[in-house]
Amino acid sequence: MRADERDQPARVTVVGIGADGWDGLSPTARRAIEGADVLRGSARQLGLVPGEVAAQRLPWPSPMGPELVELPGAHPGARVVVLASGDPMLSGVGTSLVRLHGPGAVDVIPHPSSVTLACARLGWAVEETTVVSVVGRSLDLVTPHVTPG
């Protein structure tokens, strides 16, 4: 590591990946993954990356919260790429990392979210669609949106 790199805060790149895996990634997302020294993600996400990618693959433990706190400094000098489902900034790991470490420590390369994909399939305008996330929240939040009146 160069001396000027030691003075910079460690950065993490978060890459959104869809169910279509490697084939659905943009060239920018592929380059980020191919250039990684360390890949973090779920076992399923890591399995979507071709074996030719030489990065060390580390699946998230459960719970993954303590590991997120340690990123990005857990792998000094390494290019760390975190794989995320769809859009990492829609109730995803990208949001968590930015909250923990600030936007200056995280680069995000998004993929279409499940919301965007569902709206496209149904022909609905995303901006006219109510989205209720129950990720880490009570299912009671859904009730007002699915009951009459």
Residues covered by each model-derived region:
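Class I S-adenosyl-L-methionine
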Residues: 1-117, 135-141, 146
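Short, hinge-like loop/turn segments at secondary-structure boundaries
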Residues: 57-59, 123-127
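Post-transcriptional modification and biogenesis factors for structured RNAs
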Residues: 149
